[in-house]
From Swiss-Prot:
Residues with Omega-N-methylarginine modification: R106, R120, R126, R128
MF terms in GO: RNA binding
Coiled-coil ranges from the UniProt annotation: 147-183, 422-452
Chain positions with Phosphothreonine modification: T94
PANTHER family, A to Z: COILED-COIL DOMAIN CONTAINING PROTEIN 9, COILED-COIL DOMAIN-CONTAINING PROTEIN 9
Region (Disordered): 38-543
Composition bias, Basic and acidic residues: 38-47, 59-72, 146-183, 192-212, 225-239, 256-277, 287-300, 309-318, 359-372
Modified residues (Phosphoserine): S135, S246, S253, S374, S384, S533
Top-level taxonomic group: Eukaryota
GO CC, alphabetical: exon-exon junction complex
Protein name: Coiled-coil domain-containing protein 9
UniProt organism field: Mus musculus (Mouse)
Length: 543
């Protein structure tokens, strides 16, 4: 029983393989027929002078042919005597088995038979290629008739498509020849590549009609004709420029209420502009500022330019502050000239003359006490007067200021607050310092006249050494305050240490640390009632 079943199974398997081989043969016939039709169409197109590109599926068809041959070769390699595995019933695999020549012969025979049928014009098997890939059932007579009918319909449709394509290719070739030769066709609408909008020169009636019947909507930006967009934009710009100068044109598109509001706003702006221009002029009609003299009245007839408003916006705020603009403008120009002259004088003046005003009152105090004090040793005074002029210039002037100068500074600040409208914080500080220095110069002259009397008394009390030291001592008194005070303190009868660390006496040796030396000697020193030691802030002990 087992052997009979095996034999039946082998016979059934052989029958299935035969069916598959037949289906593959039919598929190959259809592919060969299709390939031959494509070649015929290509030859025909070449004869007509139209270049046709190669079909894209040629490579895929070759792959299909190779796959068909492999499938046809695979199942036929086994011999009738060898058993077939159950999983290989689909027939898509190739097994390395014996006897491959018979299968090759059958496949080649099928290919040749298909080619022979095609050359003889046999029935088309194009509809069977979908079922030929491993279909297990047999193809009946009904299937053959339906497939033949479908293939004929497909052939008819394909022939019509080829004819249409040939006509279009002929039209394209003729159009290209005419374009090269410069000949216009009588009916350019038929050419699907023709676009009269891209052409230049005079337009014919047909092209003009076509352009008028454009696909663009009339409300689109630029209208139906896109070439008029650039010229339309230029005309619009010119009209806008012309409308800027005249205000009546702007009101044409306004309603009554908008027009009245616009006219009221326009009058207010013109009034403000005129007031601003009047603030910039003197009562005589001249410009207050020199750089405005270049302006002409014609610049403001249509209204001032926006750049003019921007350049004077900050000035308008500054001019509105003072109560009397005309007098302030005149004073401001004079004040600026004075400030520049003061700066020149300050730069040319020596730096040492700025400080002496701070200690002028204290010098009077020390000079009045000098009259009751006897003279000190001449050698110590001469040493101190020779060494101090160079050292006193190095000492910085303290930041203290007498109450009189504070009052003067306040007065100067009030004047500057009225004078400076734009740059109050910057120029006030510089101008106050310059005013104070000028007033200090005047007060210095007064104090020099007042100090001439005490100086004469000094010369009378100390006739021995004062004439020698006066040429050096007098300028130091005008320049630096601590120097004459220190020199006068040396005139006390009680021997005291030098008031300034840099002017030692005869018997004193210089030391490295003067602070320590002063602390050691301060308890044993004797001072007059009202005098101060050198370590204290003696210039401010006037209270």
């Amino acid at each position: 029983m087992a052997t009979t079943l095996d034999l039946k199974s082998k016979e059934e398997k052989d029958a299935e393989l035969d069916k598959r081989i037949e289906a593959l043969r039919r598929k190959n016939e259809a592919l060969i027929r299709r390939y031959q039709e494509i070649e015929e169409d290509r030859k025909k197109a070449e004869l007509e002078g139209v270049a046709v590109t190669a079909p894209r599926k040629s490579r895929s068809m070759e792959k299909e042919n190779m796959a068909v041959e492999e499938k046809s070769l695979g199942p036929s390699r086994r011999t009738p005597g060898t058993p077939r595995p159950p999983g290989a019933s689909r027939g898509g695999r190739t097994h390395p088995q014996q006897g491959g020549r018979a299968g090759v012969g059958r496949a080649s025979q099928g290919w040749e038979d298909g080619a022979g049928e095609q050359l003889r014009g046999g029935p088309g098997g194009r509809g069977r290629r979908g079922r030929g890939r491993g279909s297990p059932h047999l193809l009946g007579a009904g299937d053959n008739s339906t497939s033949d009918r479908k293939s004929k319909e497909w052939e008819e449709r394909r022939r019509q498509n080829i004819e249409k394509m040939n006509e279009e290719m002929e039209k394209i070739a003729e159009y290209e020849r005419n374009q090269r030769e410069g000949v216009l066709e009588p009916n350019p609408v038929r050419n699907f590549l023709d676009d009269p909008r891209r052409r230049g020169g005079p337009l014919e009636e047909s092209e003009r009609d076509r352009r008028e019947g454009s696909r663009r909507h009339g409300r689109n930006w630029g209208g139906s004709d896109f070439e008029r967009v650039r010229s339309g934009l230029e005309q619009e710009r010119q009209g806008r420029r012309a409308g800027l100068g005249s205000g009546g044109d702007m009101t044409m598109s306004m309603t009554g209420r908008e027009r009245s509001e616009y006219l009221r706003w326009k009058q207010e702006r013109e009034k403000i502009d005129q007031e601003r221009l009047q603030r910039h002029r003197k009562p005589t009609g001249q410009w207050r500022r020199e750089w405005d003299a270049e302006k002409t009245d014609g610049m403001f007839k249509d209204g001032p330019a926006p750049t003019h408003e921007l350049s004077h916006r900050y000035d308008d705020q500054a001019w509105a502050r003072p109560p009397k603009p005309p007098t302030f403008g005149e004073f401001l120009s004079q004040h600026k000239a004075e400030v520049s002259s003061r700066r020149r004088r300050k730069n040319s003046r020596p730096q040492a003359k700025v400080a002496p005003r701070a200690y002028s009152d204290h010098d009077n105090r020390w000079e009045t006490r000098e009259e009751a004090v006897s003279s000190a040793p001449e050698s110590s005074q001469s040493i101190s007067l020779e060494e101090t002029p160079t050292q006193a210039s190095e000492t910085p002037a303290p930041a203290h200021r007498p109450p009189e100068e504070d009052g003067e500074e306040d007065v100067g600040e009030e004047e500057e607050g009225e004078e400076e409208g734009e740059d109050e914080e910057d120029e006030e500080w510089e101008d106050v310092s310059e005013d104070v220095t000028e007033e200090e110069e005047e007060e210095e002259e007064e104090f020099e006249e007042d100090e001439e009397g005490p100086k004469d008394q000094e010369a009378a009390t100390v006739p021995d050494h004062q004439p020698e030291a006066e040429p050096a001592g007098k300028p130091t008194c005008e320049q630096v305050d601590p120097v004459p005070a220190g020199s006068q303190e040396l005139l006390s009868p009680v021997p005291v240490e030098p008031p300034i660390p840099f002017s030692p006496s005869e018997d004193h040796q210089p030391v490295s640390d003067w602070g320590e030396e002063m602390e050691l000697n301060s308890p044993g020193t004797a001072h007059l009632p009202g005098t101060h030691s050198s370590g204290e802030a003696w210039p401010f002990a006037n209270a």
